[in-house]
Amino acid sequence: MRKTICSAACFCLLLVFAINAEEVRVETPANIQETIDDVLRDFYNKYSLPGGISMAISYREKLVYAGAIGYADKDHKIPLTPEHRMRIASLSKPITSIAVMKLVEEKKLHLHDEVFGDTGIFDGKYGIPEYENDSVKITVKQLLEHTAGGWGNSRRDPMFSVRNVTGDEFIRTVVKEYPLENSPGTKYDYSNFGYCVLGRVIEKKSGMSYEDYVKTHILKPCGIDGMRIGGKTSEPDEVEYIGVSGQNPYSVSPLHMDAHGGWVANPIELLKLLVRVDGFSNVPDILESETIKTMTTPSAQNNGYALGWSVNRSNNWWHTGSLPGTSTEMARSSSGFNWVILVNFRPGSAPEFSGDLDRLFWTIRTAIQEWHTGTEL
């Protein structure tokens, strides 16, 4: 049901969330809260979600909504709240991109640095990739753009097909046994493995673990203390993940997927990060404006993808994520709205699910014509 909301009408609903041991007070007019809750509830009911859906929205870099429908743990009847953390899957890729761009600003890294081979970032540690029996050079920028030439979703994704090896041996095995399908820099092919390698680039150039560098240099300046790389089990502040069609959410290891799909967060935390890399002026960004412009400029091989972000001609940036038991979206729009949606469920067969998830905010935007001031993030 669509409604037109006027910000002058009605009282405010005060919600207080304890995020990172600090209270986030969200004052949302009750009719706006009800309208958004109704949109989320319609989605929840349409797909008979066995878990729940949480969402946070900012306007002009202030929090205007944080809410959730459904369960964090249905078996124990624990309601979902925006405080509950979830695996965010590929929303981890923009986080990794932000970390790489911070290293570029620190002059510890260049986008055109070669990654493999004796003269590369790893000093030949992992060998060198081959294309048609010839050694090739892959750059940091190509990994960010998914144009490295191989290891993509269109064929075999080595992140999920190479088993029983981890760490350095895992990367060495992939480079040796998975020759490239294309010359680097010539074709887009979405690659989880490429972002796994970027995590190791961050470690090499920073002298810190990937997780520690991101926490110290990206999240802490945003006032975020609770995000982490997940594990095979759920922590007390984390939801239970629900698998369908024989999928076991706890068979995947977020630790192995750290830089491409391993982070655990709640929607307010992600929004706090997003408003500090969105290029708007109300909240200071943690990256310089030219760095953000570079990060969100589409590649020559795919005008819909930049460096870790999907982009379009409307100057909107976003990313989606999907794992067994997880569906996610994070977006920045040129109109001043940012939003994060997290679901602790992924359907086995529902081709319209991701499209409906993406349309949630636009349905809300159509229903609400005027917005209140919001709360500092």
Regions found by a protein language model. Give the residues of each.
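Bacterial N-terminal signal peptides that target proteins for export
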Residues: M1-A9
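Bacterial N-terminal signal peptides
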Residues: A8-V16
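Short active-site loop at a secondary-structure junction
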Residues: Y47-S54, H76-Q142, N182-S191, D258-G261, ...
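Alpha-helical scaffold elements that line and support the substrate/ligand-binding pocket
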Residues: M55, R60-K62, R87-H110, E114-V115, ...
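The feature captures the short pre-catalytic strand/loop hairpin that immediately precedes
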Residues: D75, F170-E181, Y241-L255
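Active-site helix/loop module of the DD-peptidase/beta-lactamase fold
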Residues: R87-S90, E105-W151, K204-V244
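Catalytic-site signature segments of enzymes, centered on catalytic residues
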Residues: E130-E132, S154-E235, G261-L271
